[in-house]
């Protein structure tokens, strides 16, 4: 006897498979049933087989198909099937209290897991660390991009992301435990350069989420905070002959959805499930905010300043490293405070803040809302966001730091039996043009601010700066070889990465170098002379005046001379030359400083965010020619702007000057050292 399934929108699908209600493949259906893919969650998950690899989409709680996950858990608890599944995820969604992927952590349900971030699903992490399942931890961006490459039928992904870290096969290949023997990462050589090859993902089922579906399975995402890699995952699973199930809030009439709004076309979708509202929160922290989904822009209100604690001290010092017109990624946790400081100091409008799952611009959110943004300029698909990151699109990144060692390696992914996972950390840290790690100096901090001073209390602490980190999530050696500028900012001191290891460059005023700093470091840092004192403003209540610092660097602060290499640095970043007096002023100051050196120098000039009024081009190039003839043994220039490189190169070449213009400071310096 046919079984009648009444989907939530009242449409009817029939099939004749015994007494079980199962949606049939389209080629077996006819008439109206050919188009109607709406079923219940229980019916959808009954198609999952033992041993299937299930994509569980989500970021914290955004995009997470909770209705489907609960249905799968309930089926297993009632029937004992399906068994031995593989969970595949970029981020293991969760709230650390049992929601998210932790719902699937029953003995026998999972056999394997492949994912980027694990920290929000502690039960899943315990299964992996406890050797109860096979488990790989790969970079979040790599997993995200693998959905796209797997969809295209490629054998995998080739990238430099992960070299020198724990996912490098020379350091374990991302295997979490002894039970895991499968190699998913290979070291390869291309044109004399090392790369990592990540194998395509095994994919049989996808749990995805949208806002609206029509009976044909076309999916829109207008109320979602993120789009993540939903379309890529759906394509990958569909092309593998698998099952794509999408959880939505509502059903629209057939043909009523605008094709421009459809994020997942119906040809990729097998089942649509209308969720109960309580299982379809926009994030795990907020049921719904139209500001997160970009449906409206929130009126900018005054953001309450952070309390003046050691965390604000660190965030303030990190904010001092930001430059106007920079594209920045802020990590979760302490780095979130940098956005608060930027808002308080009125410099948000001069920065483009981003988050790895997709938001571009706006104000990043925090806590269980993390990953979304208010008033963003765009919401990118996650693979595209990581393309932007991996290709060098980030001017700066501020990331957390749980452990660091003498060579500048950083661990944020694993601490004994606790598994956090790498998340997007490896992609971001390896690719940002400037990297700023932030964290308290020891645990617990034992520091507080009183009367404009940092005060250290007595008590037992655990060091965070160790001889060697437990796991290498960031390779200091790789970064140093690439010439990447890296700072390690704490409330007590600031260190920087050098080819020889970490150098202590700043300490907080009033602290004792031996007692308060060196006694709590597991190695002897490089110290050249006396470390500078950290800016006293970061310990003082009230505004620091960071906007003035950001927009108006004094001319005298734009010069530096490296005696050992006879290399002179001129920082023109953010300068605007609008009048002939501006050109004369910079020329006079440069000539004065170069004349004082007493010999010709190797000149390196930073042209990031530089503007020259077109009518001043001849006057400026005449100045450059005069300086080159009298003071330069050689000169190189650099800017991250491809347009500026092209324009400057044309203007100099047309006037008979060799441009020698590069994308990075390191490339410009390397030219002189050949």
Feature roles, as predicted:
Residues 2-46, 60-76, 88, 94-104, ...:
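Conserved phosphate- and dinucleotide-binding cores of soluble alpha/beta proteins
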Residues 23-35, 51-62, 403, 564-584, ...:
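Acidic/glycine-enriched edge-of-secondary-structure segments
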Residues 33, 85, 110-112, 242, ...:
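Short active-site oxyanion
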Residues 42-53, 147, 201, 317-327:
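Glycine-rich phosphate/diphosphate-binding loops that line cofactor/substrate pockets in enzymes
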Residues 45, 83, 304-307, 312, ...:
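Glycine-rich phosphate/ribose-binding loops and adjacent secondary-structure elements
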Residues 56, 87, 330, 353, ...:
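Buried hydrophobic side chains on well-structured beta-strands
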Residues 76-81, 345-347, 597, 628-629, ...:
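Short helix-capping segments at alpha-helix termini
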Residues 113, 556-674:
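Amphipathic, Lys/Arg-enriched alpha-helical "gate/interface" segment within cytosolic domains
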């Amino acid at each position: 006897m046919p079984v009648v399934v009444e989907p939530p929108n009242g449409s009817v699908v029939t099939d004749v498979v015994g007494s079980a209600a199962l949606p049939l493949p389209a080629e077996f259906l006819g008439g109206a049933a050919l188009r109607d893919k709406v079923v219940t969650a229980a019916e959808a998950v009954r198609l999952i087989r033992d041993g299937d690899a299930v994509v569980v989409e989500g970021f914290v709680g955004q995009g997470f198909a909770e209705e489907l996950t609960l249905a799968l858990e309930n089926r297993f608890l009632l029937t004992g099937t399906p068994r031995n599944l593989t969970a595949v995820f970029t981020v293991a969604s969760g709230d650390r209290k049992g929601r998210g992927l932790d719902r699937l952590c029953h003995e026998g349900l999972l056999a394997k897991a492949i994912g980027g971030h694990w920290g929000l699903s502690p039960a899943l992490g315990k299964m992996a660390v406890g050797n109860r399942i096979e488990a790989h931890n790969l970079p979040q961006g790599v997993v995200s991009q693998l959905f796209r490459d797997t969809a295209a039928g490629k054998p995998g992904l080739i990238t430099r992301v992960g070299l020198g870290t724990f996912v490098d096969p020379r350091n374990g290949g991302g295997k979490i435990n002894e039970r895991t023997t499968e190699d998913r990462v290979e070291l390869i050589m291309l044109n004399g350069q090392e790369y990592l090859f990540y194998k395509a993902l095994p994919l049989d089922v996808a749990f995805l989420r949208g806002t609206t579906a029509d009976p044909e399975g076309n999916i829109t995402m207008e109320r979602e905070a993120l789009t993540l890699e939903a379309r890529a995952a759906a394509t990958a699973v569909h092309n593998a002959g698998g099952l794509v199930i999408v959880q939505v809030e509502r059903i629209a009439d057939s043909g009523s959805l605008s094709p421009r709004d459809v994020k997942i076309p119906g040809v990729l979708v097998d089942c649509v499930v209308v969720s109960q509202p309580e299982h379809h929160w926009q994030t795990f922290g907020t049921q719904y905010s139209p500001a997160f989904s970009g449906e409206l822009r929130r009126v900018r209100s005054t953001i309450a300043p952070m309390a003046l604690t050691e965390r604000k001290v660190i965030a303030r010092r990190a904010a001092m490293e930001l430059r106007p017109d920079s594209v920045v990624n802020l990590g979760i946790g302490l780095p979130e405070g940098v956005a608060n400081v930027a808002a308080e100091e009125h410099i948000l409008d001069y920065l483009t803040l981003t988050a790895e799952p997709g938001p571009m611009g706006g104000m990043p959110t925090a806590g269980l809302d993390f990953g979304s943004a208010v008033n963003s300029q765009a919401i990118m698909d996650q693979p595209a966001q990581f393309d932007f990151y991996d290709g060098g699109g980030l001017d700066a990144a501020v990331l957390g730091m749980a452990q660091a060692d003498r060579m500048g390696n950083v661990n944020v992914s694993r601490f004994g039996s606790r598994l956090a996972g790498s998340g997007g950390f490896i992609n971001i840290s390896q690719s940002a043009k400037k990297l700023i790690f932030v964290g308290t100096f020891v645990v617990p901090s034992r520091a507080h601010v009183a009367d404009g001073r940092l005060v250290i209390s007595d008590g037992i602490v655990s060091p965070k700066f160790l001889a060697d980190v437990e796991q290498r999530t960031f390779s200091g050696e790789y970064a140093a070889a690439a010439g990447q500028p890296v700072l390690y900012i704490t409330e007590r001191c600031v260190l920087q990465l050098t080819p020889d290891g970490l150098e202590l460059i700043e300490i907080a005023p009033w602290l004792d170098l031996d007692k308060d700093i060196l006694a709590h470091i597991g190695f002897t840092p490089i110290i050249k002379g006396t470390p500078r004192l950290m800016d006293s403003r970061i310990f003082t209540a009230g505004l620091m005046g960071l906007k003035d610092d950001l927009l108006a660097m004094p001319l005298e602060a734009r010069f530096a001379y490296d005696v050992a290499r006879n290399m002179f640095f001129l920082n023109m970043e953010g300068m605007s030359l609008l009048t002939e007096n501006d050109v004369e002023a910079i020329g006079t100051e440069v000539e004065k400083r170069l004349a004082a050196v007493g010999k010709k120098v190797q000149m390196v000039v930073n042209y990031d965010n530089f503007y020259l009024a077109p009518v001043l081009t001849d006057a400026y190039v005449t100045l450059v020619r005069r300086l080159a003839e009298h003071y330069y043994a050689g000169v190189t220039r650099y800017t991250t702007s491809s347009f500026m490189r092209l324009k400057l190169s044309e203007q100099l070449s047309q006037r008979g000057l060799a441009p020698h213009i590069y994308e990075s400071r390191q490339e410009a310096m390397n030219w002189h050292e050949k």
